[in-house]
């Protein structure tokens, strides 16, 4: 089977080169999501990536840059030109993606797109439909529940509606979007199979104990409650480390200046984040569950957390299958007071108990939910008649 994966992305090598020293790293979550899925697909199919580099005018110094074709993770990356002028860039992305996809298609090809990369997805989808080949739409968020104009939401919904197959995060997402009952597969996420090469060890843990969060640093994601709850818990020999961008950063930096137990580390490359996760005692996801969008989501950070072998504390996300529950500590009360109480309880456990919990979670996601296994489910869906 031949997969043409059309998306806003680049190889990990190019991403490191472009953004390694940049304070704000664009599309860092989607970059890892797609890279892992591409590498997983490449274990069972030939993969060509029609890649629109995730660059903007602040990074791109030249008016026009054409990155060379390259191989990484078993896939071939074929780049759309990077152009500073936004109008010319949109045109180049649309036209370039369409023709690159069109000319790559063969009898055993299937096209995969990110339904939220509107121009890229539309262009690749049209090429697939023109050649009579399947087009798989990956949907990681509902357009109707994202910010942006009504036009941008309708545009994304149009692209998603005209795909022939789907990858959804949750069954609720399928019920909402897939009214025509087209073939679909639920992939709540995928862990990085190469994490098996890492060797977590209790003696490598930092002291004082570190409660750790990496991701969107915004009130919407429960960061204020996490910080307030941690400070109220006042657990001896423990610190809270937070990484990522968001609207809560300014207030968080002010708190970190006055409270030495709280540390804000800005944005780091993903490998640096993973290294710090291995050193932490507890990884926390405080995302509130009352918002409507939450039942349609599964934070990719959950997979990364669990694969690290460090114990995880998370809210009871409705999009998280119950098979995950035995492997994590669950936060049922999401208020600052509830977080404080739960942190006191969890951090009263011994290092050995917490480490054992984390290692069981690691075994679960690396053996049953890694990117190779999850990608194979997409290939199996495409093989079914």
Question: At which residue positions do the language-model features occur?
Answer:
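Conserved donor-binding/catalytic core segment of Leloir-type glycosyltransferases
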Residues: 4-6, 167, 203-231, 241
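Donor nucleotide-sugar binding/catalytic pocket of nucleotide-sugar-dependent glycosyltransferases
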Residues: 33, 144, 157-198
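Nucleotide-sugar-dependent
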Residues: 221, 271-276, 285-304, 314-323
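Nucleotide-activated donor-binding/catalytic signature segment of Leloir-type glycosyltransferases, i.e.
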Residues: 250-277, 282
